[in-house]
Regions:
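Bacterial signal peptide processing site
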Residues: 71-74
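Conserved beta-propeller blade signature
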Residues: 119-120, 158-159, 197-198, 242-243, ...
Length: 428
């Protein structure tokens, strides 16, 4: 058992509750086993219409409207405020171990993956590389020959997924073990669970493939949404469940063995006069917080539900375009105004940090010693204290945003920027 992991960057059955959350049961079912058989812009989650395509100017507007904070500020936007002055200084908070600048641009959702002492990365040109975690040296590389959606890795298996639905299982050294072909495009990185490889297609299908040979164990299809994000919310697993964020602010818990839904819940209700105003997809990966599963919806709410049955624990009207982070006690959100807030169970705000507005803050991650790590659109990594939200340290990686949240491994973090820089940072 390896614990919880996330992959590396989205007309319902709602019954409104007084607190703004809603529940639905019995509207989703597992399908029989299926046979195994779009390059986005540099933005975190380009919105796209589903198979029931929107026509005219709405469809064009959807294709051009990203959710990334960068997109909210054109060239004529006001400059962001000066960075908060670090309280301690860079050398005491985090330290750059190495940088590898030999890659090409990385799409949003391209996250490094760890396998033993190696770090696997992919880039927009379809190049796959295995780097040494010690110094960033290239140990092995090859061209995938097609557009990549993402990868996942552990000490036993590396899985590479192409956007056309080709899934390849590799050894930790890069030798191909198996290949499976899906009948749909993929825009999200896979997830490696102890017992299966989990892949999500752009049409809302979740498939569990055998780790040993790539055959399909089960397939489950979400109800079709008229409008949804091109890049789906990453999936999260625990011992026997996979949690999936869906359009219309829904969360579903699937049995990892059979793909049968255990529960599903909508954490927000769709409001607004237009399709874009009613868009409330889950943003970022859901996070496990003790015995709760927490998530945030774009133009919606942040909420936590019980993992056992999906019952609402708490909910608050607070939107985000990047996502949340959590540990067993606290939840951190970058709200729609890019104010960073720490929330306690129940949704109350402990502190607010507004020194990073208009900087395109990434999804944060919680690192050892109760600190918060995140990037911004100017290529900087910042480290905050979770006790009071004060800035502890900041270092520059390059001049572009992160492709995904930082990847943690003990007291080290690995990042990949949209310009292709791979960097290792010591958090001590």
């Amino acid at each position: 058992m390896r614990g919880a992991r996330t992959s590396f960057p989205f007309p319902s059955f709602l019954s409104a509750h007084a607190d703004g959350a809603s529940r639905a049961r019995g509207d989703m079912s597992a399908e029989g086993v299926a046979s195994a058989s779009s390059v986005s812009a540099k933005a975190s989650g380009l919105i796209q219409p589903s198979r029931r395509r929107l026509l005219g100017s709405l469809a064009m507007g959807v294709a051009l409207l990203p959710l990334s904070a960068c997109s909210m500020f054109g060239d004529d936007a006001a400059e962001p405020p000066p960075y908060p002055v670090p309280r301690l200084g860079d050398e005491k908070g985090m330290r750059l171990l190495w940088k590898n600048t030999g890659g090409s641009d990385a799409l949003v959702g391209f996250q490094p993956a760890i396998s033993g002492n190696s770090l696997w990365v992919v880039d927009q040109k379809g190049r796959v590389r295995r780097l040494s975690r010690k110094d960033g040296r290239v140990e092995h590389e090859f061209k995938a020959g097609k557009a990549i959606a993402g990868l996942a890795a552990d000490d036993e298996l590396v899985v590479l997924v192409s956007r056309d639905g080709t899934v390849k299982g590799l050894s930790p050294k890069g030798e191909q073990r198996w290949e499976a072909r899906l009948d749909s495009e993929v825009a999200t990185a896979p997830v490696l669970a102890d017992s299966a490889v989990l892949v999500r297609t752009i049409e809302g299908r979740v498939l569990a493939l055998e780790r040993s040979g790539g055959s399909t164990r089960w397939s489950w299809k979400a109800p079709t949404a008229l409008l949804n994000l091109w890049q789906s919310s990453p999936m999260v697993t625990d011992v026997d469940t996979v949690y999936v964020g869906l359009p219309n602010a829904k969360l579903v818990a699937l049995d990892l063995r059979f793909g049968v839904p255990r529960w599903d819940v909508a954490i927000a209700s769709s409001l607004g006069a237009t399709e874009l105003e009613r868009l409330i997809d889950i943003v970022g990966a859901p996070v496990l917080m003790g015995t709760d599963l927490c998530a945030v919806a774009y133009q919606g709410r942040v909420a936590c539900v019980r993992t056992s049955d999906g019952e609402l624990a708490w909910s608050r009207a607070l939107s985000s375009s990047v996502g949340i982070a959590a540990d067993d006690r606290d939840l951190v959100i970058v709200d729609a105004s890019e104010v960073i807030q720490l929330l306690r169970p129940g949704g109350g705000t402990v502190w607010r940090q507004d020194g990073y507005v208009r900087r395109g803050v990434s999804t944060p991650v919680i690192v050892p010693d109760k600190r918060l790590l995140f990037g911004d659109r100017f290529g900087n990594l910042s480290l905050l204290s979770m006790n009071d939200g004060q800035t502890l340290a900041r270092i520059e990686i390059d001049d572009s945003a992160l492709a995904t949240p930082p990847l943690l491994a003990g007291d080290e973090a690995y990042v990949q920027t949209q310009e292709g820089t791979i960097a290792a940072i010591a958090l001590r």
